[in-house]
């Protein structure tokens, strides 16, 4: 099976969240009991991806390095690159060209939270795809705010529109994308849009025109949260808190995912829990390996 690498795009200036983000990256803000970046990182881990590039601003990159390190504590290989200015999501593949090499890749946006019991299974199909691209569609009641995808019964995209005034469907394209290696050359040949950015929608459109864009549907029972406003930060935190308090199980806990996937062992969990032992997070990790 081909190797697939992951990219987390955690740049941007977070102006919609000012003054909160004037001195700190949005993706370092807490969503209940974890930094926001843990959620997209966990999404890639659940897809079995262990080689991950984090792209951020010049000022925020050292902070992500301080928080996450080289990823070895979770059995990952984390690397970092700077995006000097926010010139569009598709720029991630140009910045990450060397990191991607000859492999396929997945891109997740640093402020997108995904939740759903079958999420790993849904992503597995995208990971195992030999060629082409997969995007994930989510039913929303305000599609005019998003990139909207229309698709046929076989799950093949037939139209893509960015924030359309008259949407052809209620399905928004989420911030999770799986591509084969040809995405790098596509990104390099893109022309900037009217707003001066290299648009991910244009990449998806090329795949669609080639008949190589698959749409995986996140149906009922899935949550997709985009945490770009003050209100959505609160809503996301409340959502995670409700699930965790009710079930006693954590959502998007990298230590737990690494352990359950066999990236790390019980001894390593013990070491990770030590500095956290005075709070519920550390206790959760220790309880997880009781009896081992």
Curated annotation (Swiss-Prot):
Cofactor: Mg(2+)
Keyword Glycosyltransferase: no
Pfam families, per database record: NTP_transferase
EC number: 2.7.7.24
UniProt-listed GO biological process terms: dTDP-rhamnose biosynthetic process; O antigen biosynthetic process
Metabolic or biological pathway, per its Swiss-Prot or TrEMBL entry: Carbohydrate biosynthesis; dTDP-L-rhamnose biosynthesis; Bacterial outer membrane biogenesis; LPS O-antigen biosynthesis
EC class (word): transferase
InterPro entries listed in its UniProt record: G1P_thy_trans_s (IPR005907), NTP_transferase_dom (IPR005835), Nucleotide-diphossugar_trans (IPR029044)
Binding-site positions, Mg(2+): 111, 226
Cofactor note: Binds 1 Mg(2+) ion per subunit.
Keywords assigned by UniProt, alphabetized: Lipopolysaccharide biosynthesis, Magnesium, Metal-binding, Nucleotidyltransferase, Transferase
Catalysed reactions, semicolon-separated: dTTP + alpha-D-glucose 1-phosphate + H(+) = dTDP-alpha-D-glucose + diphosphate
Domain of life according to the entry: Bacteria
GO molecular function: glucose-1-phosphate thymidylyltransferase activity; metal ion binding
Classification via CDD domains: G1P_TT_short
Subunit structure: Homotetramer.
Family, per entry: Belongs to the glucose-1-phosphate thymidylyltransferase family.
Free-text function comment from the UniProt entry: Catalyzes the formation of dTDP-glucose, from dTTP and glucose 1-phosphate, as well as its pyrophosphorolysis.
Name of protein: Glucose-1-phosphate thymidylyltransferase
Organism: Salmonella anatum
């Amino acid at each position: 099976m081909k190797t697939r690498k992951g990219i987390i795009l955690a740049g941007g200036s977070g102006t919609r969240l000012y003054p909160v983000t004037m001195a700190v990256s949005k993706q370092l803000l807490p969503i209940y009991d974890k930094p926001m970046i843990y959620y997209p990182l966990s999404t890639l881990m659940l897809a079995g991806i262990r080689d991950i590039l984090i792209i951020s601003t010049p000022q925020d990159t050292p902070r992500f390095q301080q928080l996450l390190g080289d990823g070895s504590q979770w059995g990952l290989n984390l690397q970092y690159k700077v995006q000097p200015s926010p010139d569009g999501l598709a720029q991630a593949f140009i910045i990450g060209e060397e990191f991607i090499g000859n492999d396929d890749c997945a891109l997740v946006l640093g402020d997108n939270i995904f939740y759903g019991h079958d999420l790993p299974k849904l992503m597995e199909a995208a990971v195992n795809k030999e060629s082409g691209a997969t995007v994930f569609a989510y039913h929303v009641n305000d599609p005019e705010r998003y990139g909207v995808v229309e698709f046929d019964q076989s799950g093949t995209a037939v139209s893509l529109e960015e924030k359309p005034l008259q949407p052809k469907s209620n399905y928004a394209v989420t911030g999770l994308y799986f591509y084969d290696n040809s995405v790098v050359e596509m990104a390099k040949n893109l022309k900037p849009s009217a707003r001066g950015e290299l648009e991910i929608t244009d990449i998806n459109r090329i795949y669609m025109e080639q008949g190589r864009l698959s749409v995986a549907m996140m149906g009922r029972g899935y949550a997709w949260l985009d945490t770009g406003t003050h209100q959505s930060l609160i809503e996301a935190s409340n959502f995670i808190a409700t699930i965790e308090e009710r079930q006693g199980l954590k959502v998007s806990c990298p230590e737990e995912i690494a352990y359950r996937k066999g990236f790390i062992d019980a001894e390593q969990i013990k070491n990770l829990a030590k500095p956290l032992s005075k709070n519920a997070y550390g206790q959760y990790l220790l309880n997880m390996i009781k009896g081992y």
